[in-house]
Amino acid sequence: MDTGKSKDGLKARKDMVQLNVMSQLHPVPTANRKYTLPAACFNLTPDEKRVICTFLRGIKVPTGFSASVKKLVSMKNLSITHCKAHDCHVMLTVFLPIAIRAIKPEFLKMAITRMCYFFSKISQKTIGKEELSDLHEFVVETQNQLEMCLPPAFF
C-alpha cells in the first residue's frame, strides 16, 4: 500500500495510535513484527474504480474544452495518467463531482464535492469580496469534513 508517495502508510498509522485518533485505522499487528493496515473509507474498491473509470472513458467533450478523457483513463490499471494541468483542473472541477456518485460513504462524497465546488469558485475570472469571505467559511468547514476521514499526515 505504501509506495513512498502515499500519506497513508505504516508510519502515518502509527502516528494515529500515538495521537489516539481514528482507532478504526490503527495498524493491526500480525506475526513476525508485521502489521496489517485496515482499509480506509477513502480507499476505492476495484468495483468502484471500474465504475469511475468507465464513466470517465465515456465522457465526450467539445474540441478545445480539454484533452480526450478517454485517452487518459486506463481500464487495465484502473487509473488516470498523463493529465496536463488543464486536464486536471477540468477533471477536478467538472467531472469528479459527477464521477464520485458511485462511491459509498456519503460524508466522503459530500466533502469531495464541496472541495470541487471551492476550486471551481476560486478559478473564476472575477470574485467579489463578500463571496471571498463566504468561500473562506466554506473551505474551513470543508477542511474539517476532510479531517474527519483523512489521516492527520495528509494535512
How would you label these PLM feature ranges?
Residues 1-155:
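A structural signal for the principal folded core domain
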